[in-house]
Amino acid sequence: MEIKITTLAENTAEMGYLAEWGLSMLVEADGKKVLFDTGMGVAAMHNARLFGIDLSTVDKIVISHGHHDHTGGLREVLQAMRKQVEIIAHPDIWAAKYGRYGKDPEHYAGLPFRRELLEALGAHFNLTAEPVGITDRFLTIGEIPMLTDYEEIDSGLFEKKNGKMLPDELRDDLAMVIDADYGLVVILGCAHRGIINTLKQAQKVTGKELIYAAIGGTHLFSAPKERWQKTAADLKEMGVQYLGASHCTGFRAAAFLAQEFGDRFFTNNSGSRWTLPFK
């Protein structure tokens, strides 16, 4: 199975493309085109035009979680699509999400649009904590259990409930997996619940062990180096062949992973275009 991945929004960019804090990837596999996240709001549409991509040809949208840097482009994307489209996500994407940024202890970080507005533009939300099959071999992995003893959710992320700021458990965090004949290809949003936990869930959902590639955010930028080391060790033990880091991985963690994985590591930026399997 050939898989094509076009990165439309990411923190850094290839020459001539627009970068912004966030993530958006167009994934083409098994006869379907799926837009995975929409970035902060500007880059995805801008870069899609540069690539000559007609977003009206997209079959479905998958939202990895409810943070604004993954959902901020939804309005513009739906306006460009000009049709009814299924959006697959966890119900908690609508939670009141906040983050602690610098001296601001209550910075709103959630989905920036009302559901009614998005539905008026053609969105049909399929909200579930369970895996969703886009095809038999291309699916979302559902809610991710916290299995490892070292992967923790960022303590600077919160959910407002009944007027109180509580730690956000990020139950809405999800990923996609493609069951290719050369191994699993896992598409990550932020991996807030841990990249190893995420890959284990992808294995469980598919019943397959071999992981060909994991591409996307790993949320290691705020993690201690000890976690980087344990993550790298587990990735090797799991036999992950390629690792494409994006977004919330952070430069220092990405540099560490590049040292650990050598030629099997790559950065996935705005303007990147990949065809799998790699040759």
Question: Which functions belong to the PLM regions below?
Answer:
Residues 10-12, 38-41, 66, 91-93, ...:
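Active-site metal-binding loops of divalent metal-dependent hydrolases
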Residues 67-70, 86, 166-270:
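Cap/insert and terminal regions of metallo-dependent hydrolase folds
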Residues 117-125, 179, 238:
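A structural motif corresponding to the C-terminal end of an alpha-helix
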